[in-house]
Amino acid sequence: VFQGKWAVCSLKNGSSSVESSIKNSYDFLDSFSYIVLAFDKDEAGRKAIDKAIEMFSPEKIKIMSYPEGYKDISDMLQAGLVKEINDCWWNAKSWMPQDIIGATQLKDTWLERPEKASVEYPWVCLNDMTKGFRLGEMVTITSGTGMGKSSVVRELEYHLLTQTPDKVGVIHLEETTERTIDGLVGIHLKRPYHLDECREITKPSVAEEAFDELFYRKEGEALTLYDGKELSIDKIISRIRLMAKAQNIKWVVLDHLNLVMSGDAKGDERRNIDALMTKLREVVVETNIGLFVVSHLSRQAGTPHEEGGAISLSHLRGSQGIAQLSNMVIALERNQQSEDPLVRNTTTLRILKNRYTGETGVTGYLQYDAETSRLRETIKPEEM
């Protein structure tokens, strides 16, 4: 084929012998400026290329490609394509790992990519700064103890169930599945259905109708809940992956991050949270779900968070990996000890991180209505 102009070496026993063949002729092969690998175009050939690359400097390797319909040089020779073999040899490209891509290779997919749809939050003030939330993102919601994180998350769950056709998965580690359903049905009925006295005055038929409207769909379950006792990192990650892949769930809520850490008590909290956040990020990228994560705060000097103290990213409990790996971090601030009931029940929404638009700061206020068990958008009370 090359008329003796170029050195040609063969593997003694096919692709499986690549390592031994190279070792036996290493000094000779390594003496050349570059080496063209012309292995079979199949899985065994690809593995042989990977093994050969490990044994030489990557910049020395070029990969020969075959025309469509031909597996190797033998196929081309039998078809009489001698000139074409020479062309393939001269056109061999320098080896490049699959995860390193030239920008020009991305042009077509860049131009033809589908529009990334956003889902709006239930509150206009939050949408103004964030432009909603999207699949493939991880949003962390944080506040002090007893500040209404679960109420905000429940409103988000209800919003997803009623305003999108998507399936929702929830992992509430501090409450029973019964309490989760009570909360969502209560939002639907605009009453605190989790309270005994409220359930007593609600007709069973009304509650059942609300349940059916929320959770029954022709396509299957609208809501899937985690009802396990195990809190280990691996268990929670496996359940999120199962929800996404086996049940086609698009949105998952994990409430809360720090309780998962209590199930993996080995090692220090910071490293455990780093490990969990990294795995959560990997699952989000792998499955393209939208993930909401609830996180607690560390105690700080100055005004306590429970008395309205301002929150910053450095207050996130345990690890800065929470802030670094989240697409969005939303803080809830409230003075739950205020003597003024209006102030006591008003939550400030503060964006601490916003990878999508870059806008941060106070974005609005939510007022809790105990009679309806709902959070509604409001203006800042004069007393705050």
Which positions does each model-derived feature cover?
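TOPRIM fold recognition
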Residues: 1-109
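Conserved nucleotide-binding/hydrolysis micro-motifs of P-loop NTPases
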Residues: 42-44, 68-70, 174-178, 230-232, ...
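Core recognition of P-loop NTPase motor domains used across DNA-transaction enzymes
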Residues: 59-135, 217-222, 283, 359-363, ...
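The Walker A/P-loop phosphate-binding site
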Residues: 97-191
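Cytosolic-facing regulatory segments adjacent to core modules
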Residues: 128, 162-248, 262, 363-365, ...
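C-terminal regions of RecA-like/P-loop NTPase motor modules
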Residues: 146, 196, 216, 233-252, ...
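Flexible beta-alpha connector loops of hexameric P-loop NTPases
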Residues: 196-201, 224-230, 261-274, 304-314
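Helical hairpin unit composed of two closely spaced alpha helices linked by a short loop
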Residues: 242, 249-291
